[in-house]
UniProtKB/Swiss-Prot annotation:
Sorted UniProt keywords: Carbohydrate metabolism, Hydrolase
GO BP terms: carbohydrate metabolic process; glucosamine catabolic process; N-acetylglucosamine catabolic process; N-acetylneuraminate catabolic process
Superkingdom of the organism of origin: Bacteria
PANTHER family listed in its UniProt record: GLUCOSAMINE-6-PHOSPHATE ISOMERASE
The protein, known as: Glucosamine-6-phosphate deaminase
Single GO molecular function: glucosamine-6-phosphate deaminase activity
Protein family per UniProt: Belongs to the glucosamine/galactosamine-6-phosphate isomerase family. NagB subfamily.
Record bears the keyword Secreted: no
Keyword Phosphoprotein among record annotations: no
Record function comment: Catalyzes the reversible isomerization-deamination of glucosamine 6-phosphate (GlcN6P) to form fructose 6-phosphate (Fru6P) and ammonium ion.
Pfam family, one: Glucosamine_iso
EC number(s) reported in the record: 3.5.99.6
GO cellular component: cytoplasm
Length: 254
């Protein structure tokens, strides 16, 4: 696992955008995440696109997850969110931006179809991830199998509470979602996880330095042959081997 510590959230966004842009310019398949953390990275990519530095015209994208019961046109669906935050502002082909079918009549069949669609596309080249305060990635809550596939899950009460800021009130937040499983996520060729802020420090420490455990779904990154974790100083505050990570970053072979 490669741990990159940057001074500020803005620096994290730039570093993540560097990696994503390098893939986009080779017409790669990108795994995209929603939520508040990736927004700055998407803004950086939009700015680079406007300057002619990156193109997504040859890329396709798969989202990590989607709320159960929300149609793509619902303003809080993750498909609508990723269009609002990113893909509609660059030259992505809308037809090549896919999300799990949250409004499907048969959600279980929809999850299996989503896994198959990723396989049919040749897999994901780079998967952008965030991490929740309880260690979840995607909607893989604590106790999720480390080999799980795309499936329907019940959301942890803390996740419902955290996501209520995007809705008018707590009651409107869906209690279930369709999410790529930890096994599905781990099949991406490169995992890129970003985290900022003191509220993520415990989760980052557990993911990087804690035991491999379903209690911290993010710890599955420990098993991946190419995982990059980019955090700001606040999110890195509890890392015991922080000085080594800084040294390794400064002495990387390019």
């Amino acid at each position: 696992m490669e741990i990159l510590i940057r001074s500020t959230p803005a620096d994290v966004a730039v570093a993540a955008a560097d990696i994503l842009a390098s893939y986009a310019n080779t017409s790669a398949t990108l795994g995209l995440a929603t939520g508040s953390t990736p927004v700055a990275t998407y803004k950086e990519l939009i700015a680079r696109h406007e300057r002619g530095e990156v193109s997504f015209a040859g890329s396709r994208a798969f989202l990590l997850d989607e709320y159960l019961g929300l149609a793509p046109e619902h303003e809080q669906s993750y498909y609508a969110t990723i269009r609002r935050d990113f893909t509609s502002h660059v030259d992505f082909d809308d037809a090549l931006v896919k999300s799990p079918e949250g409004s499907a009549a048969d959600p279980v069949a929809a999850t299996a179809a989503y896994d198959q669609a990723i396989r049919n596309a040749g897999g994901i080249d780079v998967q952008l991830l965030g991490i929740g305060a309880n260690g979840h990635i995607g909607f893989n809550e604590p106790s999720s199998s480390l080999t799980s596939r795309t499936r329907v899950v019940a959301l942890h009460p803390q996740t419902v509470q955290d996501n209520s800021r995007f809705f008018d009130n707590l009651e409107e937040v869906p209690r279930h979602a369709l999410t790529q499983g930890l096994g599905t996520i781990s099949e991406a060729r490169h995992l890129l996880l970003i985290a900022t802020g003191t509220n993520k420090a415990n989760a980052v420490q557990a993911m990087v330095e804690g035991p491999l455990s379903a209690r911290c779904p993010g710890s599955v990154l420990q098993l991946h042959p190419r995982a990059t974790v980019i955090v700001d100083e606040a999110a890195a505050a509890l890392l015991e081997d922080r000085e080594y990570y800084l040294f390794a970053d400064q002495n990387r072979l390019h």
